[in-house]
């Protein structure tokens, strides 16, 4: 049985057609499809982590690859250019069709002061660098591990030279983030969102009688914990496609993406009843406010 290491669904046995399938899937960087593979990318959090590790490792020798841990629990190998305490890492987004940060360069340089510092090109919101909690923990974990391995007692400064320019193509300014990109990542991997991915996930989901259609990783984790009888799948905004599944379904997600599906926040309950599906809306990360809409069966 071949299990995806990120979303923990099983792949159809008939799709496993070559010897490399298991190795590729277990790397986290490949999603097996009916006729081949889709490539996952790495998040800005993983890219920043790789830059920090490479900068430290390069104090010993020139470095071209490093292995970093991810929030999903899968170690990933990343190509780098690093020498004498300075590293450059190019983010790649796999087969994602519209990731504007694809190809952006992260730089990391060692410094005497212990700790992790974020420089130019990393956005700021309310006086704080725009680094998500999960990404910050990932970078810190890899920094500590590399520091111990190479007996390093200093710090690392991470910057994104083109961050401010690339950020203009994102929605950062609308949410109050200025001066650069955000450093994010709840799994460490970028899902290769495209039509083929949605079709592939739906085919995989057909193996299960009950599925939880989730809007993202946090909703996936919530569904996995609260509804263990349902196999969770991340479908993002592609909820209508997922509803084609003929078995029992629930939708679990945060209001931001659910209102896109419904047309507005006020219509979430109405859409649930129209589709005859239960919708669980998570209002915040602390699970202190959840509202549950029971759709009427057709």
UniProtKB/Swiss-Prot annotation:
Keyword Transferase attributed: yes
Q: Entry's Pfam families?
A: CbiD
Q: What does the record give as its pathway?
A: Cofactor biosynthesis; adenosylcobalamin biosynthesis; cob(II)yrinate a,c-diamide from sirohydrochlorin (anaerobic route): step 6/10
The family database entries (Gene3D superfamilies) matched by this protein are listed as:
CbiD-like (3.30.2110.10), CbiD-like domains (3.40.50.10720)
GO process annotations (BP): anaerobic cobalamin biosynthetic process; methylation
Q: Which InterPro entries match?
A: CbiD, CbiD_sf
Membrane-spanning parts? none
Q: What's the top EC group for this one? A: transferase
Per its record, the protein catalyses: Co-precorrin-5B + S-adenosyl-L-methionine = Co-precorrin-6A + S-adenosyl-L-homocysteine
Query: Which Enzyme Commission number(s) are listed?
Result: 2.1.1.195
One GO MF term on file is:
cobalt-precorrin-5B C1-methyltransferase activity
- Record keywords: Cobalamin biosynthesis, Methyltransferase, S-adenosyl-L-methionine, Transferase
Q: PANTHER family given for it?
A: COBALT-PRECORRIN-5B C(1)-METHYLTRANSFERASE
Q: Which HAMAP family match?
A: CbiD
What family does this chain come from, according to its entry?
Answer: Belongs to the CbiD family.
Protein's name in the database: Cobalt-precorrin-5B C(1)-methyltransferase
Q: Which species expresses this protein natively?
A: Archaeoglobus fulgidus (strain ATCC 49558 / DSM 4304 / JCM 9628 / NBRC 100126 / VC-16)
């Amino acid at each position: 049985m071949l299990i995806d290491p990120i979303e923990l669904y099983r792949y159809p046995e008939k799709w496993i057609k070559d010897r490399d399938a298991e190795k590729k899937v277990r790397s986290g960087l490949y999603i097996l499809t009916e006729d081949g593979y889709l490539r996952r990318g790495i998040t800005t959090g993983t890219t920043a982590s790789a830059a920090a590790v490479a900068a430290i490792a390069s104090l010993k020798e020139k470095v071209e690859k490093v292995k970093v841990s991810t929030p999903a629990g899968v170690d990933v190998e990343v190509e780098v250019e690093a020498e004498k305490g300075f590293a450059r890492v190019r983010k790649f987004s796999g087969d994602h069709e519209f990731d504007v940060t694809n190809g952006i360069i992260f730089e990391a340089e060692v410094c005497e002061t212990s700790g992790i510092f974020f420089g130019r090109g990393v956005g700021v919101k309310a006086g704080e660098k725009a680094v998500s909690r999960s990404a910050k923990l990932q970078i810190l974990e890899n920094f500590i591990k590399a520091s111990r391995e190479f007996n390093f007692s200093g710090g690392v400064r991470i910057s994104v030279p083109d961050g401010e320019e690339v950020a203009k193509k994102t929605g950062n300014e609308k949410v109050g983030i200025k001066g650069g990109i955000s450093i994010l990542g709840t799994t460490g991997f970028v899902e290769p969102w495209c039509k083929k991915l949605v079709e592939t996930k739906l085919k995989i989901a057909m193996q299960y009688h009950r599925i939880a259609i989730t809007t993202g990783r946090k909703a996936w984790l919530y569904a996995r914990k609260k509804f263990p009888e349902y196999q969770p799948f991340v479908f993002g905004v592609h909820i209508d496609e997922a509803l084609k599944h003929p078995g029992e379904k629930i939708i679990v997600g945060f209001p931001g993406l659910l209102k896109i599906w419904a047309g507005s926040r006020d219509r979430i309950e109405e859409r649930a009843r129209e589709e005859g599906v239960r919708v669980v809306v998570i209002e915040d990360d602390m699970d202190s406010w959840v509202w549950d809409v029971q759709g009427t069966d057709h």
